Structures are given as structure tokens and as C-alpha cells.
């Protein structure tokens, strides 16, 4: 979800175009984030140390993480943490964004911070978005007096992610008296709470 929201922000601010964004999303499917990028993003390594390890890789038959531990730059525990984040969508998006556009990581970091401020998120909320934590993301968009609204929204998003696609994002919740749509699929639920849950399409 971060990729879609941040990508939309970059397009609206003329940093990238829609063609580049589509290219980034396609390449993300075949990408695992590089350990060096993750280590720098997490503040575990400086950019200079990561580049030094990259140079050492050309001289040794060893992986980035193994060299970093061998040189004493990171611990084995830190390496395990970095490895667990290689499939993180945020890390993959940042890496492919840099590869496709040539924008340096320091500048990308500034765009991320500008994006956070523009959407009004706290640093903690931004981290939830980066980590695709749906249970924490939904309340950031869905301000509702009834807690079941956010629970239903979170359930719907989890199922979209599991069974349909990860290529989507949500916007702020809206209370409306009418809604125009081209197609609608839903179901009425009756019980302790009577409600209609559905998906509507406005256009093609």
C-alpha cells in the first residue's frame, strides 16, 4: 500500500511519470531488496560503509551480510533482522525507484518525509504504512465512531491482499448520503449489527 500511495504522490509532484511507476511495480515482482540498502535505510550502516562492503565483495567470494559481520560492521543478530526484511514491499519499492529513475537514496528519503508531512502522518504511522500493517493502517484513514467499521474495513483489506492483489491503496473514509456507481457487489448482514458490505465501481 505504501508503494501505491507514495507512487501517486511522486506522480502528482512530477517526480516520476505513470510509465515509470508502472515499470517500478512490474520490476518489484522480481526483486528482493539489497541488504546494503536495507542496512542504510535502517541506520545500521552508513552509505560509505555499505559501499566499502560492495568493494570487498569484488575481492572476496562472500555475501554482503557475511562480509559485514566479518568486518565487525554489524552483528549476526542485525544480519538476521536485515535478511527478514528483504521481502519488505517498502524496501523493494525504494530500491527499484532508485534503479529506474536514478534518484539518489538521500533524495528519496527527503521525498518520503515530504510525503509523510503532506498526508499528515506521524513517523510511527509512516512506519506502519511501510510495514503494510493493515490493522494499524485502517484507523489512520477510517475515523469512525463505531469500531466495527474499522474492523470490517481491515477484514476486507486483508482478504484483498491474500486472495486478489497487493496493488491497491485506500483513501480517507467518507460519509455520504448518495453514491454513483456503474457496478456494485455486496451482501446484507443482519444480527447484532445490521449492515450492507460491498464493493462499487465508478468507471472502467
Where in this protein do the model-derived segments appear?
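Generalized protein targeting/export and membrane-interface segments
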Residues: 118-204
Amino acid at each position: 500500500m505504501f508503494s501505491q500511495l507514495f507512487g501517486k504522490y511522486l506522480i502528482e509532484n512530477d517526480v516520476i511519470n505513470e510509465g515509470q511507476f508502472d515499470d517500478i511495480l512490474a520490476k518489484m515482482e522480481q526483486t528482493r531488496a539489497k541488504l546494503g540498502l536495507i542496512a542504510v535505510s535502517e541506520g545500521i550502516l552508513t552509505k560509505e560503509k555499505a559501499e566499502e562492503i560492495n568493494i570487498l565483495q569484488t575481492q572476496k567470494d562472500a555475501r554482503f551480510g557475511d562480509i559485514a559481520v566479518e568486518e565487525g560492521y554489524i552483528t549476526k543478530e542485525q544480519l538476521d533482522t536485515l535478511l527478514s526484511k528483504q521481502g519488505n514491499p517498502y524496501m523493494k519499492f525504494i530500491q527499484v525507484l532508485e534503479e529506474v529513475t536514478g534518484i539518489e537514496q538521500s533524495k528519496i528519503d527527503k521525498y518520503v518525509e515530504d510525503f509523510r508531512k503532506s498526508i499528515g502522518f506521524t513517523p510511527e504511522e509512516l512506519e506502519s504504512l511501510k510495514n503494510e500493517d493493515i490493522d494499524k493502517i485502517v484507523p489512520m484513514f477510517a475515523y469512525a465512531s463505531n469500531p466495527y467499521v474499522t474492523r470490517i474495513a481491515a477484514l476486507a483489506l486483508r482478504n484483498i491482499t491474500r486472495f486478489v492483489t497487493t496493488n491497491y491503496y485506500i483513501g480517507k473514509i467518507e460519509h455520504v448520503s448518495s453514491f454513483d456507481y456503474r457496478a456494485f457487489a455486496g451482501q446484507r448482514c443482519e444480527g447484532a449489527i445490521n449492515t450492507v458490505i460491498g464493493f462499487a465501481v465508478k468507471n472502467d
